[in-house]
């Protein structure tokens, strides 16, 4: 422990008193532990165990008398232990079904070890809904969905009896209610204890689940649950589109003229270490960047709290709608703002949110659509239960009343309560705070702060978006190459080399004109374009309806001047025979100078094409990417301005390709972007022509060029396209890419009505 920290605790005890440090004999059999402030009073000791085991007890706290405070086996109380209970790692087990109506399950055990399965079968005339086989996971929870045997005879479907719960209520018609409780007092019920069959045939509230006190959620489960509510809120743009599908449940439709208020509440109380608070901040930053990458109007509030809340950013500020300002404010949030406050006052931080809402309503007018159409999402990140102030549930009630949250306005408020760590997280309190909606979960407990960061890194999976929102790739760690660049397509015109292209709408592909050099264009109906991953079920072949090649392209145009190949106007369009269904494997990239790209860049509606070029290519060295034949995303640096002039000089020095060239501009016109000056720059291979040259801005991707030609082929002579050779000594590699900013007139001529273009 740091000397200054030890001195702080001595001073806290007052003059003449000595701090009593706690006993260090606190090891756990089969596990480890961490200390928040060494062995001094106030320090928190947290135990951890290998996957599939849990610590008992979970934690201890060093008191001022030098004794350890140890929790009861119950998840709701603590006591001062008269003797030290030996800490051990115990095996995790999953709860057994307490009842299964109209069917059987097997094997029948009191509880189930990690790795075991339980199977469900229905009686005759009943149909199984949910998972027929469920697997006991290392976090103490079953995978899959609750198995239910139903005959469909009632107004609402049989709500089932989830594992570990007991239900009263056998009728499922309109107005009927069912009630749930846990079959053991040691368990904690999350979800709705009471549900009512509604006129729309859906049960009110959310499915109740009983959990062991030591159970927790995996990051992928939480990310999936958040996606259900947030992905479609951010991606849906057509208010008349029917988005209700069985797999996704509820959808929030927000028009481009609508608005989302996002409130991020970060716990900074004493039980949160400064390191974990920094992870809270990083997670919030990831959330902000992801949400601002979608095409909706967003205001973000940031509030840190311990004994009292501190507003870092208010939704009432214009700055709350600027992603840069929001992230700057997040960075400025300091753990030390609350260093003298030891409590966790969740009520006060929620009342601060209520006050913001009240002020905004007063400003906009209670009866105006500007106020009524705002959606509100609250995300509470905490590592413990509220231990001071009024009941947080009362604050939630006031918020719901202010927003008039009733059955027909339930979609206008989502509250996510995320507990981090197993120190003193109160399942009951989290469940009371989280929203209750059919098919969704809003209360979670994660094992640690690192798991929280994983959620925000992997959330908002675009595979669920059904409209043609452009330039969105799946950046999660487990995404495939095609999911990261879903606009990438490949095709092979007859006997020519494979070429690449980019999906720019649901039916049009942009590529290079030289892919069609010396072939019979009337045979285009025989070509096949591979969209999606051609090596998996997600890949599909499309026929070509039409080919449009820039009329100025002629590879032999300057042969008489001693220039064997000339690639000006090296651009073409393919119209597919049918529209591509949007998915995580197939989605268009954003083309600059279009309305879609303008919204993705979050620029004002009055922006111009020149504004886009300035924003995307203003630096003399611009990091960008292209996609290799094997699907890998490779890196280049585009050169502009004076650096472009330096970059193209290598052409005149290459006497093997251009033996008599005296003026570089005869070969490299201002249509071309240049790369290859950096040693770490990748060089495209033959067969990668026509692919997108693109760059990213806040999780959205924009095509600024397409691969055209180069001075060095790193794959020449190699049958393995995964191996790229370095250029031999004396050879200066350079690559040239058609700039989409220079061929705007041609693009507008042929894509008018397909894409909405901005003024030049």
UniProtKB/Swiss-Prot annotation:
It comes from the Eukaryota. Residues 1-18 form the signal peptide. Residues 261-459 form the VWFA domain. The active site is at 514 (charge relay system), 570 (charge relay system), 689 (charge relay system). GO terms for cellular component: extracellular space. Keywords: Complement pathway, Disulfide bond, Glycoprotein, Hydrolase, Immunity, Innate immunity, Magnesium, Manganese, Metal-binding, Protease, Repeat, Secreted, Serine protease, Signal, Sushi. Its main location: secreted. Precursor of the catalytic component of the C3 and C5 convertase complexes, which are part of the complement pathway, a cascade of proteins that leads to phagocytosis and breakdown of pathogens and signaling that strengthens the adaptive immune system. Component C2 is part of the classical, lectin and GZMK complement systems. This is Complement C2. It comes from Mus musculus (Mouse).
């Amino acid at each position: 422990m740091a000397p200054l920290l030890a001195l702080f605790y001595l001073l806290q005890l007052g003059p003449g008193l000595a701090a009593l440090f706690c006993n260090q004999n606190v090891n756990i059999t089969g596990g480890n532990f961490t200390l928040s402030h060494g062995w001094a009073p106030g320090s928190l000791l947290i135990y951890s165990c290998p996957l599939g085991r849990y610590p008992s007890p979970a934690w201890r706290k060093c008191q001022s008398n030098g004794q350890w405070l140890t929790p009861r086996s119950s998840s709701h109380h603590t006591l001062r232990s008269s003797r030290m209970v030996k800490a051990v790692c115990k095996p995790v087990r999953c709860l057994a079904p307490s009842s299964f109506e109209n069917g059987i399950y097997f094997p029948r055990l009191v509880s189930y070890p990690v790795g075991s399965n339980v199977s469900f079968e229905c009686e005759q005339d009943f149909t199984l809904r949910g998972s027929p086989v469920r697997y006991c996971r290392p976090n103490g929870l079953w995978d899959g969905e609750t198995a239910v045997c139903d005959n469909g005879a009632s107004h609402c479907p049989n709500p089932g009896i989830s594992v570990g719960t007991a239900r009263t209520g056998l009728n499922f018609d309109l107005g009927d209610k069912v009630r749930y409780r846990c079959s053991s007092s040691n368990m904690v019920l999350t979800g709705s204890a009471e549900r009512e069959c509604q006129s729309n045939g859906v049960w009110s509230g959310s499915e109740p689940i009983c959990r062991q006190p030591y159970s927790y959620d995996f990051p992928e489960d939480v990310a999936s649950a958040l996606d259900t509510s947030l992905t479609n809120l951010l991606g849906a743009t057509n208010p008349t589109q029917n988005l209700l599908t069985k797999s996704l449940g509820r959808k929030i439709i927000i028009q481009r003229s609508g608005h989302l208020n996002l409130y991020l509440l970060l716990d900074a109380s004493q039980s949160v270490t400064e390191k974990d608070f920094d992870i809270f901040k990083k997670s919030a930053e990831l959330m902000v960047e992801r949400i601002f990458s979608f095409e909706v109007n967003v205001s973000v509030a940031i509030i840190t709290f311990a004994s009292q809340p501190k507003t870092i950013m208010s939704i009432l500020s214009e700055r709350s709608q600027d992603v840069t300002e929001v992230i700057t404010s997040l960075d400025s949030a300091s753990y030390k703002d609350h260093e003298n406050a030891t409590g966790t006052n969740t009520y006060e931080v929620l009342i601060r949110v209520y006050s913001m809402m009240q002020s905004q309503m007063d400003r906009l007018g209670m009866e105006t659509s500007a106020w009524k159409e705002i959606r509100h999402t609250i995300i509470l990140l905490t590592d413990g239960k509220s231990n001071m102030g009024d009941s947080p549930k009362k604050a939630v009630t006031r918020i719901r009343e202010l927003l008039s949250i009733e059955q027909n306005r339930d979609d206008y408020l989502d509250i996510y309560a995320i507990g981090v760590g197993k120190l003193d997280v109160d399942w009951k309190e989290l469940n009371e705070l989280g929203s209750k909606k059919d098919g969704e979960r809003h209360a979670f407990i994660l094992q640690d702060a690192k798991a929280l960061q994983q959620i925000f890194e992997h959330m908002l999976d675009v595979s669920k978006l059904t409209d043609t929102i452009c330039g969105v790739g799946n950046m999660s760690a487990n995404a495939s190459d095609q999911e990261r660049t879903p606009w990438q397509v490949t095709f092979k015109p007859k006997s020519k080399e494979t070429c690449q292209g980019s999906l720019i709408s649901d039916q049009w592909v942009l590529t290079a004109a030289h892919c069609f050099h010396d072939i019979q264009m009337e045979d285009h109906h025989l070509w096949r374009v591979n969209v999606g991953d051609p090596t998996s079920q997600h890949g599909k072949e499309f026929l070509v309806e039409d080919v449009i090649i820039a009329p100025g392209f002629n590879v032999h145009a300057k042969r008489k001047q001693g220039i064997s190949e000339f690639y000006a106007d090296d651009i073409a369009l393919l119209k597919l025979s049918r529209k591509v269904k949007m998915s995580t494997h197939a989605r268009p990239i954003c083309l600059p100078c279009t309305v879609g790209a303008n919204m993705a860049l979050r620029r004002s509606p009055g922006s111009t094409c020149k504004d886009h070029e300035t924003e995307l290519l203003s630096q003399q060295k611009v990091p960008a990417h292209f996609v290799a034949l094997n699907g890998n995303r490779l890196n280049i640096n585009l050169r502009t301005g004076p650096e472009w002039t330096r970059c193209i000089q290598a052409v005149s020095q290459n006497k093997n390709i251009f033996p008599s060239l005296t003026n570089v501009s005869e070969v490299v016109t201002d249509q071309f972007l240049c790369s290859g000056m950096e040693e770490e720059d990748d060089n495209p291979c033959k067969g990668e022509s026509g692919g997108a040259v693109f760059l990213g801005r806040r999780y959205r991707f924009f095509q600024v060029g397409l691969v055209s030609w180069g001075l060095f082929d790193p794959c020449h002579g190699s049958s393995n396209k995964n191996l790229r050779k370095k250029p031999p000594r004396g050879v200066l590699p350079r690559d040239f890419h058609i700039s989409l900013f220079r061929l705007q007139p041609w693009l507008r001529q042929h894509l008018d009505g397909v894409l909405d273009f901005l003024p030049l």
